[in-house]
């Protein structure tokens, strides 16, 4: 195999070019003025929709009326051939989408006006834009993102670009920290090398740049104009979301619901009480203790010290009172083993004395809807890396996501088709349109699944890195063989299992499952509805079928559905974004792609 060599070169703008750019400028200056055009020319009145044809250069503040003109300008003025790069690197739509956002972010941070890439071999190379965060528009009004592939006929993935952009814009703001802008430099000949894992390193800051204020962040807001604001505002917004999040757990109703969830509570109880070798005499940390039920189990199991961490002030007081009532609380007046710390785990040092890497067992019920909603896993991983001993136990220690296709019975359509003898299906159709953008959390009956379940993603909580919380995975759905007939797949359902495996729970490993095949839990399942149902049938039904109709129709059912699913933490703190791509495969190997859908939970 040819040796891989990548040259990733930054070219600074010349002194002549520098004169053309104001040192006082910022990302907001890169937007067109109120008239939307350059050179002070007056704009003719129109229907107010010119923003869709206003394309901003990737490297400077020039505006163009078409992508072709923009990319030609980038090639001639900045040495960047976008179409050539796509062809050379074989970038699909999503990789190209990420590349544009990556360049925007680097230019905003580094003010580099030219960029060159050369390579002998790109096989197995991971480029710096190959991260899920670059699926979020860096600039919310970026028309280029849904227009750059308009003229390409061989694009493998088909989609409604306008609809995709509308959905992507719902992902919200994106903040860029420019505190270090201009602090580091590199020469024009500096090259990015490939390390042992074949990762291409990120762009370094260019030299000769004006230092920006350390308190400034560039924030793309919901308004038409980007704003430059104090960086502390972002932290305040995060704190506000955290306060609302932890405050929501101050209601006793949600705790009753969780405690009444026997599948959930008994799985944790069995893991803590039926593994004496693990718990007896150990130091235990419970992240997000709520009422303290898991900490009480740990104390009962013989732990020598239990640190219960709770960020909700009210619930920290409740957990303290419960621990005292059950005679396990530990302070100057009580001789128990359980301590309650009112704190976020990231700030635990301020609330309690505990040495780093001194915890034997880290336990937490961190899972949210679709496993990752609420983004609490990041806090658990922080606690693992900060407090857990090397080789210490984390409970649960595995998490696995599954996916399957569901039929019409899992939707509300049948209800609205016959309401006391009246046809109200128009309501059902309107609800259906909403569910193609918003996930539904509900219990799916096993009988309503029309495909076999399949594995989507696995997490090893003992070893995973925090950035692996965001992921992209593929799966193939096969129609169920139990009913040898054609059925409509209206969407996919996601669920998860968490495992207390024999790695740590040697005496009594157990599994907490939220599957449609097991008793329901308060997590239910997460439902993602297709924009249009896909007809599927098992191979036995399709044998000899040589129809020419579109794949996935009732006349030509798909033999399987290939999925590409991405889950990433959203801009809105503690929310997640889910992108879903579906491809129907015929028994003859033909394919049909459906538009990508983006959901926010």
Swiss-Prot record:
Residues at the active site: 365, 374
UniProt-listed Enzyme Commission number(s): 2.1.1.319
GO molecular function, one term: zinc ion binding
Biased composition (Acidic residues): 14-27, 35-50
Reactions that this protein is recorded to catalyse: L-arginyl-[protein] + S-adenosyl-L-methionine = N(omega)-methyl-L-arginyl-[protein] + S-adenosyl-L-homocysteine + H(+); L-arginyl-[protein] + 2 S-adenosyl-L-methionine = N(omega),N(omega)-dimethyl-L-arginyl-[protein] + 2 S-adenosyl-L-homocysteine + 2 H(+)
CDD domains according to UniProt: AdoMet_MTases
GO biological process: methylation
Primary location: cytoplasm
Basic and acidic residues bias spans: 1-10
Subcellular localization(s) per the UniProt record: Cytoplasm, Cytosol
Domain SAM-dependent MTase PRMT-type per the UniProt entry, residue ranges: 242-554
InterPro entries named among the record's database cross-references: ANM3-like_C2H2_Zf, Arg_MeTrfase, Methyltransf_25, PRMT_dom, SAM-dependent_MTases_sf, Znf_C2H2_sf, Znf_C2H2_type
Signal peptide (UniProt feature, chain positions): none
Keywords, alphabetical: Cytoplasm, Metal-binding, Methyltransferase, S-adenosyl-L-methionine, Transferase, Zinc, Zinc-finger
Catalytic class of the enzyme: transferase
Zinc finger (C2H2-type) stretch: 57-78
Cellular component aspect of the GO annotation: cytosol
Region of interest called Disordered, as start-end residue ranges on this chain: 1-50
Job description of the protein: Protein-arginine N-methyltransferase that catalyzes both the monomethylation and asymmetric dimethylation of the guanidino nitrogens of arginine residues in target proteins, and therefore falls into the group of type I methyltransferases.
Family membership: Belongs to the class I-like SAM-binding methyltransferase superfamily. Protein arginine N-methyltransferase family.
Name the record gives this protein: Probable protein arginine N-methyltransferase 3
Species, as recorded: Arabidopsis thaliana (Mouse-ear cress)
Gene transcribed to yield this protein: PRMT3
């Amino acid at each position: 195999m040819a040796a891989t060599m990548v040259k990733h070169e930054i070219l600074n703008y010349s002194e002549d070019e520098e004169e053309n750019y104001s040192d006082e400028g910022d990302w907001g200056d890169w937007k067109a003025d109120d008239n939307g055009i350059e050179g002070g020319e007056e704009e003719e009145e129109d229907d107010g929709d010119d923003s869709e044809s206003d394309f901003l250069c990737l490297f400077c503040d020039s505006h163009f009326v078409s992508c072709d003109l923009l990319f030609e300008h980038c090639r001639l003025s900045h040495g960047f051939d976008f179409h050539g790069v796509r062809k050379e690197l074989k970038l699909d739509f999503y990789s190209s989408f990420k590349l544009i956002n990556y360049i925007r972010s680097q230019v905003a941070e580094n003010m580099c006006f030219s960029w060159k890439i050369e390579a002998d071999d790109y096989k197995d190379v991971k480029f710096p834009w190959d991260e899920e965060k670059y699926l979020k528009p860096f600039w919310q009004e970026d028309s280029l993102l849904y227009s750059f592939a308009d003229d390409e006929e061989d694009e493998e993935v088909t989609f409604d670009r306008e609809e995709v952009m509308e959905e992507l814009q719902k992902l919200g703001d994106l903040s860029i920290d420019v505190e270090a802008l201009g602090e580091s430099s590199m020469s024009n000949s500096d090259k990015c090398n490939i390390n042992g894992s074949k990762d291409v390193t990120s762009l370094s800051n260019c030299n000769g740049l004006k230092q920006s204020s350390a308190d400034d962040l560039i924030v793309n807001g919901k308004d038409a104009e980007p704003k430059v604001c104090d960086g502390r505002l972002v932290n305040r917004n995060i704190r506000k979301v955290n306060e609302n999040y932890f405050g929501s757990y101050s209601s006793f109703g949600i705790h009753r619901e969780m405690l009444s969830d026997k599948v959930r509570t008994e799985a944790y109880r069995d893991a803590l009480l039926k593994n004496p070798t693990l718990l007896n005499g150990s130091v235990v940390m419970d992240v997000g203790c709520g009422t303290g039920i898991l900490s009480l189990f740990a104390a009962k199991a013989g732990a020598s010290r239990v640190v219960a961490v709770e960020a909700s002030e009210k619930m920290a007081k409740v957990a303290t009172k419960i621990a005292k009532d059950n005679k396990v609380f530990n302070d100057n007046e009580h001789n128990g083993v359980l301590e309650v710390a009112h704190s976020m785990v990231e700030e635990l040092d301020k609330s309690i004395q505990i040495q780093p890497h001194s915890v034997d067992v880290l336990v937490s019920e961190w899972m949210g809807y679709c496993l990752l909603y609420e983004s609490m896993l990041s806090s658990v991983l922080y606690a693992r890396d900060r407090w857990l001993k090397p080789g210490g136990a984390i409970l649960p220690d595995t998490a696995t996501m599954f996916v399957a296709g569901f039929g019409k019975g899992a939707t509300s359509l049948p209800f609205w088709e016959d309401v006391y003898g009246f046809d109200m299906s128009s309501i059902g159709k309107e609800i259906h349109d909403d569910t193609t953008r918003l996930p539904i959390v509900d219990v799916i009956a096993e009988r309503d699944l029309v495909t076999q379940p399949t594995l989507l993603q696995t997490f090893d909580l003992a070893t995973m890195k925090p950035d692996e919380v965001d992921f992209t995975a593929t799966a193939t759905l096969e129609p169920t063989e139990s009913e040898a007939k054609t059925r409509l797949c209206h969407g996919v359902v996601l669920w998860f299992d968490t495992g207390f495996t024999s790695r740590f729970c040697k005496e009594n490993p157990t599994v907490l499952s939220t599957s449609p095949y097991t008793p329901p839990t308060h997590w239910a399942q997460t439902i993602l509805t297709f924009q249009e149902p896909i007809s599927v049938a098992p191979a036995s039904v399709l044998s000899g079928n040589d129809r020419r109709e579109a794949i996935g129709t009732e006349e030509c059912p798909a033999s399987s559905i290939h999925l590409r699913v991405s889950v990433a933490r959203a801009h809105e703190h503690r929310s997640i974004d889910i992108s879903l791509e579906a491809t129907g495969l015929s028994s003859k190997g033909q394919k049909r792609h459906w538009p990508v859908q983006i959901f926010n939970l």
